[in-house]
Design a protein with these regions (language model features):
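N-terminal low-complexity, acidic/polar interaction/targeting segments
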Residues: 1-168
Length: 168
């Protein structure tokens, strides 16, 4: 898959997010994916200050994403709207034709086990996130309501992680 290095952002499965892309390798990756209507593989950089990352500058777990919309801006950069599909892990990554190409394996999500431990952890997670949201004051009540309505545990964890202010 064409691979897009990201700085200071992680895209999770089921997340829809606009990205601003300006580096030639990144634009080439988008163009390659769109030419074949393929998904793109999004990998966070280990150090976001690295201007021209190599394969060793990228994390090994990322997100396979669908490109929903592309808008070329007058300054030569591209605004792209992506939706995370599933988590993936790099098997191999190489630089070819001015872009990164990755062979990716799917990362298995944990099945929703029907046991009391999982349910207790889920309740604790929701309570802790609610407290975090009250302290943070930047998370709207509708987001909290949406999160409380998510039944799938993997999706719940990804959605909460997407709303936390964490450093990579």
């Amino acid at each position: 898959l064409a691979t897009l290095p990201l700085r200071d952002v992680v895209v999770y499965p089921h997340m829809v997010l606009p990205l601003f892309v300006g580096r030639p390798k990144s634009i080439a990756a988008l163009e390659a994916a769109m030419a074949n209507d393929d998904p793109v593989f999004l990998l966070a950089q280990i150090d976001p200050n690295t201007e021209d990352p190599t394969a060793s500058d990228l994390h090994r777990t990322g997100t396979v994403a669908q490109v929903l919309q592309v808008l070329k801006l007058p300054d030569g950069t591209v605004k792209v709207l992506v939706e995370g599909i599933r988590r993936g892990r790099v098997l191999t990554i190489e630089e070819s034709g001015g872009l990164f190409l990755s062979h990716v394996e799917a990362v298995n999500e944990y099945a929703d086990a029907d046991n009391s431990d999982i349910e207790a952890i889920r309740r604790t997670l929701l309570t802790q996130f609610d407290q975090y949201a009250k302290l943070n004051k930047k998370i709207p009540a509708e987001i909290i309501n949406t999160i409380n309505g998510i039944d799938d545990n993997s999706r719940l964890v990804d959605t909460i992680a997407a709303h936390l202010q964490l450093k990579l």
